[in-house]
Regions:
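Catalytic core of nucleotide-sugar-dependent glycosyltransferases
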Residues: 1-199
């Protein structure tokens, strides 16, 4: 590649949220985190499937259901589940052991930046391509929403959590992302370019 390109990796920053979420409650529990993002998150059947897959297991599960699903629509919530409308995702991912996600670009980058392996369930747009790339680099696995079962999701979680090669791949990507500089590196390169060419 020529000097015309500067790769600075993803730009990761905290997101503002109105949700009251106590991170101290989960810091020592290394939860599984489940979210379908902020756009196509009206998925009651999927959330119920997650409860069936992980309810009353040894895992602590944090599930973000967005603003289009009401908590009472999900029925009884198991004691090992924390279900919220929204959560501080970038902060939560620092303590997460597995992220089950739709595979949006932001969510995927934020997970890998924090060294979190992925189960991707792509829904639309670029998500199938992102899911394919994540599986190609060994940082997670991809499942299909249309045929997904609770047993399949539980088995996939165990597969990811107990696979050393996935954890190694994720650790390598985390190191690469965190060394790349992000938006601060981009700003530095822009000012360097301006200075170099007297702009």
């Amino acid at each position: 590649l020529t000097n015309s390109y500067k790769f600075v990796g993803p730009s990761i920053s905290s997101r503002l949220t109105q949700e009251n979420f106590d991170l101290t409650a989960i810091k020592e529990k290394s939860p599984i985190y489940i979210s379908l993002g902020t756009v196509l998150n009206q998925a009651i059947d999927f959330y119920k499937l997650c409860i069936k897959a992980f309810g009353n297991t040894e895992h602590t599960v944090v599930m973000s259901i967005g603003g289009q699903t009401q908590l009472d629509e999900l029925g009884e919530i198991p004691e090992n589940f924390i279900v919220k409308t929204y959560v501080p995702q970038t902060e939560l991912l620092k303590y997460t052991k597995l992220f089950i996600t739709h595979g949006g670009m932001n969510s995927t980058n934020e997970a890998l930046y924090n060294g979190v392996p992925l189960i991707l369930i792509p829904l639309s747009a670029d998500q199938p391509i992102i899911a394919e790339q994540v599986t190609n680099i060994g940082a997670g696995i991809s499942l299909q929403m249309q045929t997904l079962t609770a047993n399949q999701l539980n088995e996939a979680a165990n597969q990811v959590l107990n696979n050393p090669s996935i954890h190694k791949a994720v650790a390598n990507i985390k190191e690469s992302f965190q060394k790349s500089g992000g938006y601060q590196k981009a700003v530095d390169e822009i000012f360097k370019f301006k200075s170099q060419y007297g702009i």
